Amino acid sequence: MRTYVINLDRAAERLAHMRRQFDQLGISFVRIAAVDGTSLSDRELLSFRTLAENGERPYQWMPSEIGIFLSHKLAWSTIASGDDQYAAVFEDDVHVSDEIATLLKDSSWIHNSADIVRFETTLQGMKLARKPISQAGQMKVFRVYSGAWGAAGYVIKREVASWLASSPPRTFGPVDWFLFHPESVVAPALSVFQLDPAPCVQDQYHPDVDSRRNLGSHVLTPTGIAQALKTGSRRLLSPMVRKATGRRGIPYA
C-alpha cells in the first residue's frame, strides 16, 4: 500500500516534519505537490467556484480551501492510476503514532467493504457502530454513522479514488465535508470506517500541547459572518450533546 503526503512547495518545514516521522517508522512515501490556492488566477478560482456551486447552500470558498480540495483530487487521480487496491493519504501537518507503521506496510487489516478508513481524530464526537467490524493491531475498526471532520489522514480504495477524482466538486464546504458530511453529494454512497484509538492527529488538535510543533494552518481564518458560518458547525460537542446523540470522541493513540 503506497503512502502519499500532500505538501506545498513552500512548506519545507512541514515536509521535514513528515519525513522525520516516517523515516523513524521505516515508511517511505510519495510527495504530492499541493496546489497553492493563493497562486491560482481569478479565472481558475471562478472556474472551481462555478463547478462547486450548490444553489441550496452557497459557500464562501477561500483560495486556500480550493487549493486543498484540488490537492486531494490530485492525490485521488494519482492513486487511481496506480496498481494498489488501497493507498494512504496524509496532509503534512499531522502527528502519527508508532502503531501506524504496521497498518501502512500491510493492507490485509482493511475490511473488503471499506471505501475509506479514517486514521485521524479531531477529538470531535462521532457516531460509530456499537461493535467493531475488525481489529487492526491495537486499534478497533468501526463503521461511521455520522459526519466527520478532517481529511488529514485516511486510506482510500483505488476505485473510490477514481470516482472521486472524476466527480465535480459540488459541495457546500471543504474537502472533508465533501467526503464525510451526510448532506454531501458523494458521502452517502461511501462506506467509511474509523480507527479507534486514532493513530493520526493534526498538529492543532494534538491533545498534548507540548507536542505541538506550531506548524500553523494554510487556511486563512475568515472574519465576520463567514467566520460564524465556517466555525459554528465545527465547535466541539459538549458531553451532554454527545451522550444524547450517541456520539463519542476518538482519542489519539
Describe the role of every protein-language-model region.
Residues M1-F90, V94-A253:
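An acidic/histidine-cluster motif and surrounding catalytic segment
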